[in-house]
Amino acid sequence: MLKLLRPRPWVCNSCLNRVAFPKPYPVGSRSTRWLSTAQSAAPAVSIPPVNPVPADHTTSGTHDDALLGKIFDCSSAWRDFSARSAKFPTENAGLFRNAYLTSPDGFLTFAQSSLSKASAIVNRVLGASTIEEYKTIVRDLDRLSDLLCRVIDLSDFVRVTHPDVRIQRAASEAWYMVYQYMNQLNTMTGLNDQLGKAMENSDVTKTWSEEEMAVAQLLKLDFMKSAVNLPQAARDRFVDLSQRISEIGSDFVNEMAPEQRRVVLPSSKFQGMDPQIARRFTKHGYMQLPTMSGEAAAALRTVHDEETRKAVYLAIRTASSRSVGLLEALLKHRAELADLAGFESYGHMTLRDRMMAKTPESINKFLVELSKNNAPRVLQEVDSLLQEKKTLLASPSATLNPWDREYYIQRIRNAQGKNVKHDNFFASYFSVGRVMQGLSRLFTRLYGIRFVPRETLPGEKWHPDVRRLDVVSDTDGHVAVLYCDLFYREDKSPNPAHFTIRCSRAISEDEISEAAVSTSEGGPAFGSPESAANDGMAASRGASGGPLKQLPTIALVCDFPQRDNPLSGSKSKPASLTFASLETLFHEMGHAIHSVLARTSFQNVAGTRCATDLAELPSTLMEYFASDPSVLSLFARHAETDEPLDYDLLAERVRSRGRFEGCDTDYQIILAMLDQAYHSPLASSESFDTTRAYHDLQREHSPLGPDPSSTRWQGFFGHLFGYGSTYYSYLFDQVLAERAWKKVFSSGQDGAALSREAGEHLKESLLKWGGSREPWRCVSDVLRDERIAGGGEEAMALVGSWGTSNKSTMKH
C-alpha cells in the first residue's frame, strides 16, 4: 500500500530527453547500507513560533515585486537581503525549519520519532472495532502515510541535493529506515482488511466526504497492487519479483550500451562537420567517433556524405544484445508479476491506479486517433525534406532514407535561420529576476497569489544560493513555501525538477494535543503545540482562522548559468535565460502552482498527487504562457536598455523551431505505442521479440516507416523502466493543454492569458482538487465539454482526434 504513496519528483520528459541515457530518480544511490555507528539525538533548541502570515506580508505588493526581482538579479541586493537573517536568534532552526534537522544526527531522531507515531497509528487501526473507530480509518491511514512521507520525501531530496556529504549520508540512513518500515507494512493484511470493513459499512461511509472516499478508494487499489490478498507463498513470490524487477531495471538503465562503441571511418568522409570536433576525434587519418555522443548526433545533422551518415545512424540505432536482453527480462518479469496479482498484463495492473485511461485499450484508441490526426503534417514535412534532397542532388528520383532526415532538417533550418535571432539575443530580455517577477505578476492576475521574498533562519537552507519565497494569497494569507535553487553548481543534477518536500494536509486538534504532550517529554523545543504538530515547518489556519493545515513546501531546482558569485563584492550582470530555459522554468512552475493551489485536507491527494496522466497538464499549459505576448509584456525587457522585447522576433524564432514538430510527434506516438505493446499480454509469449514488435509498429502506424531491420533501438528506451505502460501521458497532456489554452484562454487573444476569470475557472475546475476528484470530471469542466465527462474508450479516442498543432502556427 504505502510504497506507492510517495510521488516521484517531477523530472519532465522534455528535460530527460536532454541526456543520452535518461536515468530514473536515484533510489539508494548515495548509500547502500546503514552506518554501524550509533547516532546521538539532535540537541534541543528553542524554535521561535512561526506566524501564520509573516509580518512583512502586509507590505505593499509593489514592494514585494521590486524586491523579488532584485534578490535574483542584483548581487548587492541579495547580499543585503541575506544579511537580514542576522537579526534572528543564532540557534539553528533546522533544514526547512524542521526542528529535528539541526545536525546530521537529527535525521535519525526525526525518523525514529516519526516511526514511533506511525506504529501507534497502525495499532489503532488494527484494533478498530466500533463504528466510530472505523469512521476515522481513512484519516488515520492518511496520517500514517504523511508521517512516513515527511521523512522519505525530505530525505530523498536532501540526499541527492545537499552539498554536505555527512548530511547526505544521514538523510540516506533516515530514508532507508522508514522505507524498510513501509515494506513491512506492505506485507500486513490487517490494514487492508480493516479498510475493507470500513468501506463495506454504510454507517461509516455515509459520514465520509467526497475527498475522504477518494482517498479510501486509492488506498484500496494500492493494497490490491501490493498483492496483500494473496496466500503467503504468492506474496513472497510477489516481493521477490518486485525486487528482481528493480534490480534488472536499474541495470538496464545504467548499463545500456550500443553494439558498436565507435564509428571508425576515414576523416575525409566527415566533411561538413565542425573542424574542431573532427580534429579532436581524428587519429592517423581516421575519425573515431563515440557512438553514443553529442558529436555523433551532430554528424547526422552536418556530414555531407550519405554513406557516412548511414554508418553513424545504424550504430546509434543499434543497442547491444545485453541491453536488449535486460529489457526483455524486465518485461517478462513484469508480465509474471501482473499475472500473479490477477491482472491480464502489466499494463492492466498499472493503469488501475491513479490513471485516467484505465485500460490499455483506451490508450491505444487515443494513440491511433492522434496518429491519424498527425499523419498529414508528417507527410507534408517529409515531402519538404525529399524536395530539399532532390534539389541538392539534382536527382528527381532521389528517395529519403532514415539517415537523411536530420541532415535535411538542418539544411532547411539553416536557410530559414538567416532571419531568425539567436537564443543569446533573447537572453538579454530574460534575466532570472525579471522572469520571477513576471511569474508572480501572472499568478497575481490569474489566481490572486504572489511571491514574497522571505528571510531564512540559520540552518534553514542547504546552500547560500537558495532563495525562500512565501506564496501569499489575497484572500487566504500565507499558503505555501517555495525554495528556489536555480543556479548551476558542479554538484547539482542538470535536470530541472519540482520536489514536494511536504504536502498539504489538515492537522486535527487531537494531533495538536498529542504534540503538546510529546514536546513536554523531550526532543526539540517548539514555540507552540501547533508548531510541534508540523515539526516546526510552515503551517497556517488561514486568514479566517480555520483548521490548522501544514502548508505545501516545495523545492524548485534548476541549473541556470550564473555570471559570477552573487555574494562576492564585484559588480555583476544578472543571470539570464535562453527562451528554452524560460519555457523550462514556466513548466516547472506549473507543477509548483498545482501543489500550491491543491491544498487538500488529505496528503494522499494533495497537489500533484493526482492521476499520473493528468499531472503534466498544468505544467504543459504553462509553456503556452511563456510565449504569449501579453505575458511577456509583464517582464521581458532588455537588461541594459530597459527596452521591451519585440515580440515579432520571438514569434519568428518559435516558428522556426517548430518547423518539424509533426515528425517529432510521430516519433513520440510510436514510442508510446511501443510501451503499450511491451506491457501487453504479448510479453508473456515465449516467442515475444522486442525488435520485431518495434519495427512492426513503425511499419503499421508511422508515415516515416520502420528502422532498418538490423537495428534494435529499443535497448536505449530507458523510460520503459520508470514509466512502464504510462509513456503516453505526455502526449495525452499535450493535447489537453493545447485544448485548454484554446478553450479557456482563447489562445491568448486580446490579453486572455491574463484573465482572472479564466484563471479562476482553471483553478476551480481542475487545480484546486489535486487528486481528490474524478479527473475526467475535472477536465470536462475545464473544457466545458460533457462528451468526455464519463471517460472510457470513446473519451480517449475523442481527445486523440483533437490532435496537437504546431505552437508556432497558433494565433496569439
UniProtKB/Swiss-Prot annotation:
Zn(2+) binds at residues 587, 591, 594. GO terms for cellular component: mitochondrial matrix. This is Mitochondrial intermediate peptidase. Keywords: Hydrolase, Metal-binding, Metalloprotease, Mitochondrion, Protease, Transit peptide, Zinc. InterPro entries: M3A_MIP, MetalloPept_cat_dom_sf, Neurolysin/TOP_dom2, Pept_M3A_M3B, Pept_M3A_M3B_dom. Binds 1 zinc ion. It is found in: Mitochondrion matrix. Belongs to the peptidase M3 family. GO terms for biological process: peptide metabolic process; protein processing involved in protein targeting to mitochondrion. Residues 1-35 form a transit peptide. It comes from the Eukaryota. GO terms for molecular function: metal ion binding; metalloendopeptidase activity. The active site is at residue 588. Disulfide bonds: none annotated. Cleaves proteins, imported into the mitochondrion, to their mature size. While most mitochondrial precursor proteins are processed to the mature form in one step by mitochondrial processing peptidase (MPP), the sequential cleavage by MIP of an octapeptide after initial processing by MPP is a required step for a subgroup of nuclear-encoded precursor proteins destined for the matrix or the inner membrane. Its cofactor is Zn(2+). Its EC number is 3.4.24.59. It holds the Pfam family Peptidase_M3. It is an enzyme of class 3 (hydrolase). Residues 518-544 are annotated as: Disordered. It catalyses: Release of an N-terminal octapeptide as second stage of processing of some proteins imported into the mitochondrion.
